[in-house]
Design a protein with these regions (language model features):
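Conserved beta-strand-loop surface patch within small alpha/beta domains used
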Residues: 1-44, 52-115
């Protein structure tokens, strides 16, 4: 079964926190996730999540959530979507494909049930 998974990534590239949904196409808001983001805000560099059935793009919901997070934290984070064949990143208002990918991208695919 595939599912969307979220990793909170630290400035040193470590996975600070993770959670998963029960759906391959949605990662509903979670109080636990919001609390983790707030508690880890000084260490948090990036929020990554999977799109196990695609697309390799940020959704409208992703975009509005990213804007809300940046406003709440008072700074811009880096965001990424890991899809079956590619990884995209949004950093400083630019969106691009990332290659090579960080070490945790394969782990995110595995946790998401991607083939």
């Amino acid at each position: 079964m595939s599912q969307e998974v979220c990793f909170l990534i630290g400035f040193d590239g470590s996975i600070l926190w993770a959670d998963a949904s029960n759906s391959p196409v949605a990662l509903p808001d979670s109080r636990d996730r919001w609390e983790a983001i707030w508690q880890l805000r000084d260490e948090l560099a990036e929020i990554a999540h999977s799109h196990p059935v695609g697309p390799s793009a940020f959704s409208a919901e992703d975009t509005s959530t990213m804007a809300a997070l940046d406003a709440a934290l008072g700074r811009k984070l880096r965001y990424s979507v890991v899809a079956p064949k590619t990884m995209i990143v949004r950093a400083e208002d630019e969106t691009f494909e990332l290659n090579p990918e960080p070490w945790w991208a394969g782990l995110l695919r595995l946790a998401s049930g991607m083939k």
